[in-house]
Amino acid sequence: MSCYTAILKSVGGLALFQDANGAIDLCRHFFMYFCEQKLRPNSFWFVVVRAIASMIMYLVLGIALLYISEQDDKKNTNNASNSNKLNESSINSNS
């Protein structure tokens, strides 16, 4: 059963990543529209602002994914420690 769970988590993670990628792309299009109206598209500052905005968006995405994975790891650790305590208590009660 754990194989199916791993596959579902993997597919779910890929779906969330694609959704986040689409959100970043949408933000980039809005930002590019704003920059093209205010700055010249071939100016140095346009390129700098665009690069910084892209880095910030990907940084936020990376931090969000890291936070989600850490929360999942903590939940799995808590579940494992609870099951170990239950196993120890059942062994002690059987002795």
UniProtKB/Swiss-Prot annotation:
Organism whose genome encodes this protein: Variola virus (isolate Human/India/Ind3/1967)
Induction summary: Expressed in the late phase of the viral replicative cycle.
TM spans (from-to): 46-66
Segments of skewed composition (Low complexity): 77-95
Membrane topology of the entry: Single-pass membrane protein
Superkingdom: Viruses
Signal sequence region: 1-22
Keywords, comma-separated and alphabetical: Glycoprotein, Host cytoplasm, Late protein, Membrane, Signal, Transmembrane, Transmembrane helix, Viral envelope protein, Virion
Assigned protein family: Belongs to the oerthopoxvirus OPG135 family.
Pfam families cross-referenced by the UniProt entry: Pox_A9
Topology Intravirion: residue spans: 23-45
Glycosylation sites: 79, 87
Name assigned to this protein: Virion membrane protein OPG135
Ranges of the Virion surface topological domain: 67-83
Renumbered residue ranges of the record's region Disordered: 76-95
Function: Envelope protein. Required for an early step in virion morphogenesis.
